[in-house]
Amino acid sequence: MAGTKNKTRAQAKTEKKAAIQAKAGAEREATGVVRPVAKTRAKAKAKTGSKTDAVAEMKAVSKNKVVAETKEGALSEPKTLGKAMGDFTPKAGNESTSSTCKNEAGTDAWFWAGEEATINSWFWNGEEAGNSFSTKNDKPEIGAQVCAEELEPAAGADCKPRSGAEEEEEENVIGNWFWEGDDTSFDPNPKPVSRIVKPQPVYEINEKNRPKDWSEVTIWPNAPAVTPAVLGFRSQAPSEASPPSYIVLASAEENACSLPVATACRPSRNTRSCSQPIPECRFDSDPCIQTIDEIRRQIRIREVNGIKPFACPCKMECYMDSEEFEKLVSLLKSTTDPLIHKIARIAMGVHNVHPFAQEFINEVGVVTLIESLLSFPSPEMRKKTVITLNPPSGDERQRKIELHVKHMCKETMSFPLNSPGQQSGLKILGQLTTDFVHHYIVANYFSELFHLLSSGNCKTRNLVLKLLLNMSENPTAARDMINMKALAALKLIFNQKEAKANLVSGVAIFINIKEHIRKGSIVVVDHLSYNTLMAIFREVKEIIETM
């Protein structure tokens, strides 16, 4: 692009010089036709129009003539100039010079020929037409350049050179105007667009909001006194992980009296030091720091004057009276629950929340709400308190268990035979009879139990046998089982149709009774009863061996 541009510019300058010299000769021979015409047109334009229009007309005429010369010369004589280039040698130099001078008159006549409208339309076709013209007619341009170089000595001998001012004017009109416009349109090295970063505004500390003494500074619970964020010491570091924050709004004197010395002086790992700023509010609200003294004074002003002097940025209002406020302060000193402190801050108007939440707290009553929360702890804590602080005495517990066993025995016997309720009661009684203490209660219902054993189904018999097996381990209860009715009912279960589990339980009952008699735990005084008992044992033994 740059090489083609320089080549075209050099060619235009050469053609311009040839045109100037030819034009000077034509002025001498043709009595100066060009300049009078241009001046006449300029004067006519100056009379009818402004000076600006005259200058533009003169520049347009000069441009049209130069371009017409370039176009006509390149189109009409490509072959002649090509031959002149091919035959141009050091020996034939003089001949070509003479032939060039002979054609000078014809060139002058051709130079001023042409139609102005055609030249104007061709000249303003744009860069595309100029580029295609230069590439297609490369050889004719070279021929025209050689011809112009040979015309220079011939015309220079006969013609007078033009002044420097006129040449500079032509240069400004044609060369500089054309190429400067091209350079301006296409910048090879555009400047990058940079982003302007505006500095962040620096907020100055408002001296009016600074507290006068430490009594106006908020005291946070379980932590040393810190300066609130409204004083200007805002945190620039990322927020650290901290436990749930809550505020006990109190003055320095009240907080020093309410907090023990060990709590105030002991450094905590989770608390912040005095030099560390208060963390930002976690909710979508601006923190509003007010002391209890300020809120108390504002409530008194409102009660006396009937106005609302609250000018805090959160635009929340405190709807409590002085009596309710003092009760709330006393409740806050007795607890450190974060939920209760947050509810208190909402009621005091120092924590910005949804209006519905504040309206709910104000309608219910903040004191009533906090008292109910303090009176009803969590279910786990309440259950633990019942077990640890109010344990029942041994006699009371034993009495309740005896009542429960009697109640279960009555209900079990009252249910229909083989009913689910009866079977559930037998299962519970089997669990209760694992302890010998309650055997004397169940022994009162032996007749009903042996009736169920003889008339119940397989599952009912299984539950009754488990209960009797537990009772047979106790010598006192086993003594009550040694009678003809009970032993006859036990002997009936030993048959081929009985379940194996029931047979095992029946054998275990007889073994327990035999062991009690052998050890002397059970003494049989009546020989008739003893003989009957031994006969039943032999019969049961034979049945078991047969099975």
From Swiss-Prot:
Principal location listed in the UniProt entry: cytoplasm
Tissue distribution: Highly expressed in brain. Not expressed in lung or liver. Down-regulated in brain from patients suffering from Alzheimer disease.
Biased composition (Basic residues): 1-10
Assigned GO CC terms: cytosol; extracellular exosome; nucleus
SUPFAM superfamilies assigned: ARM repeat (SSF48371)
Compartment(s) where it occurs, according to its Swiss-Prot or TrEMBL record: Cytoplasm; Nucleus
Stated role: Survival and differentiation promoting protein that plays a role in the regulation of neurosynaptogenesis. Induces phosphatase PP2A activity which results in APP dephosphorylation and inhibits BACE1-mediated processing of APP.
Quaternary organization: Homodimer.
Name of the protein in its database record: G protein-coupled receptor associated sorting protein 3
UniProt source species: Homo sapiens (Human)
Lineage start: Eukaryota, Metazoa, Chordata, Craniata, Vertebrata
Gene it is expressed from: GPRASP3
